């Protein structure tokens, strides 16, 4: 399966430790397309349907689309590098504007 930045995929986050996100849930890929084509891992951010308002830059709301059936928050402070084996399927994609906003919020989390 070809994986690109901005793709929303279903990922198995088990096993979890401490306050990490768990479950099989959607996540958005943020690693670059070149890396995604040669590495066996991807960098991604999990999504949650447990919506919390006014939490930027830690969360970013996106609307349902394609096979993402519910509005969701991207959990920007829960960045992960995981094996592609954990990815079950692609279900949607962020728009370019959403992806750019996501990266801006991620940068705020890292400073």
Please annotate each region the language model reported:
Residues 1, 19-21:
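Short, surface-exposed helix-loop/turn micro-motifs enriched in polar/charged residues
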Residues 14-18:
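Short, charged beta-turn/beta-strand-edge "cap" motif at the junction between a beta-strand
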Residues 28-33, 89-93:
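Short secondary-structure transition/capping segments
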Residues 21-23, 29-64:
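Compact nucleic-acid interaction/catalytic patches
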Residues 1, 64-111:
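C-terminal terminal-subdomain/extension
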């Amino acid at each position: 399966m070809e994986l690109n930045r901005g793709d929303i995929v279903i990922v198995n986050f088990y096993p979890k430790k401490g306050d990490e996100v768990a479950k099989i849930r959607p996540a958005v890929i943020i690693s670059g397309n070149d890396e995604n084509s040669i590495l066996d891992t991807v960098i991604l951010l999990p999504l949650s349907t447990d919506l919390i308002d006014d939490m930027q830059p830690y969360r970013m709301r996106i609307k349902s689309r394609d096979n993402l059936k519910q509005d969701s928050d991207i959990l920007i402070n829960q960045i992960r590098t995981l094996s592609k084996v954990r990815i079950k399927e692609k279900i949607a994609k962020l728009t370019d504007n959403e992806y750019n906003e996501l990266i801006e919020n991620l940068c705020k989390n890292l400073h």
